[in-house]
């Protein structure tokens, strides 16, 4: 997650902001996947280190973390555009003011919502396919919260 993960994602994000350059969807996905996707992925993987999960399930959890992390960041972009500052506890539309590239700016609000929902559904599908029953209910709740939050 270091120089080829979160750090690289943050660097690319800062550079695009400094250059005030427009990014395409692939660029946005790369930046957000490296930043928030890798952060959530690492958190999920650290949480399972002491488990007895086999390698296949560990890979599935890694994929879950990456997808739900990306969904979280997309939804964060959406909230910056549509949220209520009194609920969020921070000013809205700060991404626009700071010339940040966001999913909403690149592909619009409707498509951003669609992609975030799709990633959340894929994430939950990964968990369901692991066959671990109730032991993953907290992760499923986390995934649902990440894209249904209002702050």
Label each region the model flagged:
Residues 1-151:
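All-alpha prenyltransferase/terpene-synthase fold signal
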């Amino acid at each position: 997650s270091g120089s080829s993960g979160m750090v690289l994602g943050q660097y690319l994000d800062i550079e695009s902001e400094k250059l005030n350059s427009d990014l395409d969807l692939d660029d946005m996905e790369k930046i957000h996947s490296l930043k928030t996707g890798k952060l959530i992925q690492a958190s999920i993987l650290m949480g399972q280190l002491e488990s007895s999960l086999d390698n296949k399930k560990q890979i599935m959890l890694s994929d879950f973390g990456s997808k739900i992390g990306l969904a979280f960041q997309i939804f964060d972009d959406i909230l910056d555009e549509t949220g209520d500052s009194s609920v969020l506890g921070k000013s809205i539309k700060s991404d626009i003011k700071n010339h940040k590239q966001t999913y909403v700016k690149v592909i619009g609000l409707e498509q951003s919502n669609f992609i975030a929902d799709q990633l959340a559904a894929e994430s939950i599908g990964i968990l369901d396919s692991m066959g671990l029953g109730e032991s993953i209910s907290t992760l499923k709740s986390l995934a649902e919260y990440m894209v249904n939050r209002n702050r």
